[in-house]
């Protein structure tokens, strides 16, 4: 047993290897099996009482087989011998019903992470249900105290604390069989501020990390949630115009996700990307770098290999604005005549940085002078082929580098190729949201759609 998990890594490797061995016995050309298991505790509190307290556990096995160029897959949540045999039979049968694909199949032998490094990601919290409940109650009480000290009508919303551990094992018919363990811990708080001239404002603050001790004091989340809610009271729309836009650090990863999705192998080989064929070309302002690091200790998107067994590498995705690489799994790499980059599951940890001056959040406001700070996205999206981007947003209007008033009921519109070329600064107010670490991002000109 590993942390909150009810199984251990060895048993997962055995189950994955057994599924592959049985599939090969049925005559398939190749097979791979991924087995996952995990568990944890999550606590939610509202109004000083527990709203939910859950101790959960899960396990699953997914099998993929290749036969005569055809691919079949099946999965189960039971790991007994009979269930594994049933999954093998189902995957084998499905492979006989689909069209062949010459580019499907296991990762190339030489690309597999046979004995490469696996980053440290496991850090069991050692927390009990009682200690997590106490932490959640403390977070809620501190949020309520901060709300009581704020001006106007403010109250604590739901708060939550969670701690979990996860295991994963991969086996393939090429002989690859490795496993890895990871932990994830979270805490977040919400606050609601009544606005006599409009709808109530709901804001939040959160922290997540592989290490429980790195979540920081609950007082920080409590205070930040209340301060954000109070600051957003009295929001109003503005007239449509063109102006600079500063994306707050916790929102900025949305722009990075839109960029990286255009560099996925599937988007590239199908030409369904606004960055089709972008390798080696300028795709962003020439002061920007985007770096990928799969081996960051305790990184939220770290890993020793993807679900095909291919290791990622520390590498530049963008260097001085130029595209240096795509995110490729084996199938998309073959279709492009390239080599897998170990990104069959998507990007590893990403870090956006700039060679241009940035600064604190206040310095970024001063650099913008007059424009819109975006603090929340409220609906919209982008066209992956054209790069057209539209979002309903809220935030703050700034003049002379100072916040004038909160802003609601506005939309932003632009084209992602133009937006990335018009980034003039990245702040030093860096935050990590999932796989992405970035500061605030300043775009020097965008279309703002408000009330006439």
Predicted segments with their positions:
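N-terminal cap/recognition module
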Residues: 50-95
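Dual-mode signal for accessory low-complexity, basic/Gly-rich regions
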Residues: 150, 222, 262, 276-452
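A generic local secondary-structure boundary/capping motif
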Residues: 21-23, 50-54, 127-131, 139-150, ...
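Short acidic, glycine/serine/threonine-rich loops at helix termini
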Residues: 42-47, 164-183, 199-205, 255-261, ...
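Acidic low-complexity segments
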Residues: 1-16, 30-42, 82, 86-178, ...
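Residue-level structural signal for beta-strand termini and adjacent loop
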Residues: 76-78, 205, 329, 409-410
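Short beta-strand elements
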Residues: 54-67, 178-207, 318-319, 393-400
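Translation machinery proteins
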Residues: 29-57, 61
């Amino acid at each position: 047993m590993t942390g909150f998990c009810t199984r251990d890594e060895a048993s997962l490797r055995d189950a994955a290897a057994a599924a592959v061995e049985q599939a090969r016995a049925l005559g398939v050309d190749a097979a791979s099996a991924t087995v996952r298991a995990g568990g944890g505790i999550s606590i939610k509190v509202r109004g000083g009482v527990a709203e939910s307290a859950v101790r959960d556990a899960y396990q699953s096995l997914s099998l993929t087989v290749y036969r005569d160029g055809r691919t079949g897959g099946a999965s189960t949540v039971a790991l007994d011998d009979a269930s594994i045999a049933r999954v093998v039979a189902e995957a084998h049968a499905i492979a006989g019903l689909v069209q062949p694909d010459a580019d499907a199949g296991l990762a190339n032998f030489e690309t597999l992470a046979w004995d490469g490094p696996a980053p440290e990601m496991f850090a069991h919290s050692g927390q009990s249900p009682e200690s997590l409940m106490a932490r959640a109650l403390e977070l809620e009480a501190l949020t309520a105290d901060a709300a009581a000290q704020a001006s106007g009508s403010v109250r604590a919303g739901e708060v939550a604390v969670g701690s979990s551990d996860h295991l994963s094992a991969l086996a393939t018919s090429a002989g690859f069989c490795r496993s890895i363990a990871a932990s994830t811990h979270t805490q977040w708080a919400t606050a609601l501020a009544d606005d006599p001239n409009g709808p109530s404002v709901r804001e939040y603050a959160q922290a997540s990390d592989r290490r429980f001790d790195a979540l920081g004091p609950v007082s920080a989340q409590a205070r930040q949630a209340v301060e954000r809610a109070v600051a957003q009271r009295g929001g109003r729309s503005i007239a449509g115009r063109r102006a600079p836009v500063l994306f707050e650090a916790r929102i900025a990863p949305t722009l990075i996700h839109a960029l990286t999705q255009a560099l996925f192998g599937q988007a590239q080989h199908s030409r369904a990307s606004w960055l089709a064929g972008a390798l080696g070309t300028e795709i962003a302002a020439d002061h920007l770098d985007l770096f990928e690091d799969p081996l960051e200790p305790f990184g939220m998107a770290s890993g020793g290999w993807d679900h095909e067994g291919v290791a990622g590498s520390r590498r530049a995705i963008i260097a001085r604005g130029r595209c240096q690489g795509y995110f490729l799994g084996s199938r998309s790499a073959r279709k492009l005549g390239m080599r897998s980059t170990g990104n069959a599951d998507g990007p590893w940890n990403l870090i956006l940085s700039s060679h241009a001056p940035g600064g604190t959040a206040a310095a970024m406001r001063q650099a913008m002078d007059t424009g819109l700070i975006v603090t929340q996205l409220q609906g919209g999206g982008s066209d992956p082929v054209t790069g057209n981007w539209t979002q309903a947003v809220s935030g703050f209007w700034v003049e002379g580098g100072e916040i004038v008033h909160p802003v609601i009921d506005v939309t932003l519109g632009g084209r992602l190729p133009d937006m990335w070329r018009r980034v003039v600064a990245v702040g030093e107010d860096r935050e990590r949201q999932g796989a992405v670490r970035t500061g605030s991002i300043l775009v020097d000109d965008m279309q703002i759609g408000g009330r006439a």
